[in-house]
A protein has these predicted regions:
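Alpha-helical tetratricopeptide repeat
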Residues: 1-178
Length: 178
C-alpha cells in the first residue's frame, strides 16, 4: 500500500510524501528492492529540483538584462561541494548499492547511478556504470549515448563518437544531433 501511494506521490512531484511512504515500505520489508530503487530515484529528483530552484533564485536578473545573452554565465549556481548536498548524494548512492546487492542484473540501477556520478563529475565511475549496464543489456541505447557524452567530455572523441553512433543505431535520435 505504501509503495503504490509513493509512486502516486512521485508522479505529482510530492517528493517528501513519496519518501515518507517509501521509508515505511522499506521498514515493513527490508528486502523490498524496488522500494530502495524508487527511493533513490525520488531523492535524486528532489536534489535536482532543489538545485534548479536555488539556481533560479541566485541569478541576478539585472545583470542578465545588462549583458549580451551570449556573454551570460550562471556563475552564482550552488556548488556541488555543499555538505548537505553531499550527504543527499550519499543517501542516493547507498540506496543504489542496496539495490545492486539484491538485484545485480537490474540495468537501470547502473544507468541511474552513472547519471548521478556524472552530475558529481565522477566521470570514471559514470563510465564504469554505463559500461556495466551495456554489458548486461547490449542494446541499451541510452547507456551508449550517455557514455559517449562522457567520453567526449573527457576528450576521447574516438570512443565518444563510437558510442554515439551505436546509440543512434539503437534508436536514440538525439545522438545524431551532436
Amino acid at each position: 500500500a505504501y509503495f503504490g501511494r509513493a509512486v502516486d506521490f512521485m508522479l505529482v512531484q510530492d517528493f517528501s510524501s513519496a519518501l515518507d511512504d517509501l521509508n515505511r515500505a522499506i521498514m515493513t520489508s527490508q528486502n523490498f528492492t524496488l522500494a530502495y530503487f524508487l527511493r533513490a530515484v525520488v531523492r535524486a529528483k528532489q536534489i535536482e529540483y532543489q538545485l534548479s530552484a536555488e539556481s533560479v533564485q541566485s541569478i541576478d536578473f539585472q545583470q542578465v538584462r545588462s549583458k549580451n545573452s551570449k556573454d551570460f554565465s550562471l556563475s552564482g549556481l550552488p556548488a556541488v561541494g555543499n555538505e548537505s548536498l553531499k550527504m543527499e548524494y550519499e543517501m542516493v548512492l547507498r540506496d543504489y548499492e542496496k539495490v545492486i546487492e539484491s538485484a545485480p542484473r537490474f540495468i537501470y540501477v547502473y544507468y541511474n547511478r552513472g547519471n548521478l556520478r556524472c552530475s558529481q563529475q565522477d566521470y570514471r565511475g559514470a563510465i564504469a556504470d554505463y559500461t556495466e549496464a551495456i554489458r548486461l543489456r547490449p542494446d541499451f541505447g541510452d547507456a551508449y549515448y550517455n557514455r559517449g557524452l562522457v567520453y567526449l567530455k573527457q576528450g576521447d572523441t574516438v570512443k565518444g563518437t563510437a558510442d554515439l553512433s551505436k546509440a543512434g543505431e539503437l534508436g536514440v535520435v538525439a545522438a545524431y544531433n551532436l
